[in-house]
Amino acid sequence: MDNTKINMLLNNRKYPLFKSMLNNVTQGDTIEMMKQIPNNSIDLVLVDLPYGTTQNKWDSVIPLPELWDQYHRIVKENGAMVFTASGLFTAQLMLSNPNEYKYKYTWIKSKATNFLNAKKQPLRKHEDILVFYRKQPTYHPQMTEGEAYNKGIRKNQVTGSYGDFNPVMVQSKGMRYPVDVLYFKTAEAEGKVVHPTQKPVALGRYLIKTFSNPGDIVLDNTSGSGSFLVAALQEGRNFIGIEKNEDGTLFKKKPVDYIKITESRIEQTIREMDANTLMHLHKINLLSNNEALND
């Protein structure tokens, strides 16, 4: 999204809070705060909604029909809506909007969970990432390196399971298209864990690079400790974080303020950037709206 369109959104008098929300994390109820975002302004939703699978007070499923109403209003028609999920919540999320559900990734984690039930159930070592959209969104396949090959010409086929196709040369210079199974280390591999369900920044960066362009606006409307906001910043995207910031405790002992934690992580990310990156972010106006980042 170019600066002209960003400035038009910021000057929309119907949504006076939007300017303070852009490139910040805002405390409040997710549905109510999403009502402060202009129509058709979000390029990508990347969010780790509460699954309703833990005993944490905050881990209750947000009414999905109300969420979809807001997503449909604020997300561009060709914007992707990408959700982490697991277990029963995966099914609930799929069935809440089957017409727009397209596919899912399986995220293989470096560390398993469910140890308390290890003698009764298998350990859980993956989560799902569900992708929804109305029209084909931005998609940048994150290629990986492999061995080059040339298998010659594949003959035409008229009875295939996936439709007819003409003869085609089957070869590769070594780059491989991504598959729907991803491996990323869990959040503790990146440093201190400050949220019970904290996601790794690296996972967020991969998905943001896949489904958005530099300068786009990424929304995480239940942003927790801010991993996906940090990922958006590192990839040169504008971002909006919303966090209710209630009933938060670390390991059921110490109360935590996720707004302050997120702001601190964002500021630390800025401090660790090199001069060229900072110059680029200022050039595209990404940092100009956050006073804390301009001190």
Question: Which residue stretches match the model-derived regions?
Answer:
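Core catalytic lobe of class I
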Residues: 1-242, 246-255, 259, 294-295
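Conserved SAM-binding loop
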Residues: 262-263
